[in-house]
Amino acid sequence: HKVVQVQGKVIPATRWWGLDITCDSVDIGLIDFWTNGFFSNPQGRAYGNLKVFGQEQQVWVLADVLGKNTQLTVPQLGSTFYFSDTIHMDSTSIRIPKLDVYDAVGNKGTFEGIITHDKFTNFKYDLNAHVDKMLVLNLPPDPQALFYGKVYGTGDLNIHGDDYNCKIAVNAKTEDKSKFYLSVNTASIATSSSFIDFVSPDTS
């Protein structure tokens, strides 16, 4: 069984070269080098065609890759998401069409986004998800962490940033069995912010 089949051509006179790569059940973990920072622990198998060609110092990539039984973890949230669908790649971006995703306990949501890059450096990403009672935060207790806990949510999530900064915007409500812990230091700082108020539940 051939996991990867490669065919290529080189034209010395013009310094042009091209590779046609067919993937058949390639370990998705190979992408960890490029996705580390916004995704971690990628797992699953990849199928599809990848064209890589270039001339002089220029390199272009075109690919449509089907990921089967794929799982990706968002390290900032500690949550792992699962899907089987096709991802599109070219020389400047990785495009994820709207696809169905599942959490570790089988709850369903949707996910889409785009990751841009400069020859696979200087990554920027804009990722969106709609979740329905999904496990969106799953961080173990850590006295050094700003927050931790296990949170199930329904609503919308946006993660955007680059190699150096990450911003997470959430418009969602928590569901049953959610437990969220905020460190004392973080709570003190947050209380002094004009846009955050901590309130006690009305027990009257």
Language-model features: where?
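Short beta-strand segments that buttress and anchor functional surface loops
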Residues: 1, 97-104
